[in-house]
């Protein structure tokens, strides 16, 4: 089983997810597969948030912790980036430079 380094970078996480997918037999899933699965995880995050905020929920649904759902989302995000050859660390820094130029107004 692959292992993460101490204090991993985004590159380390992306490599780890790539190795996990190979080990678990998910490496052949398409980007469309991963995007759809990501959407499912976002829905599960919404349910977990509803539960944590005391909103009405389906009592028959299984719920996990918000942190678990965020982790699942992050794994799918890394998998999608890997399929497109996107270095998330570089992409984040580049996008944040664009965001710094934007004017954010309060409503």
Q: Which residues fall in each region the model found?
A:
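Flexible "arm" and connector segments at domain edges
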Residues: 1-70, 74-107
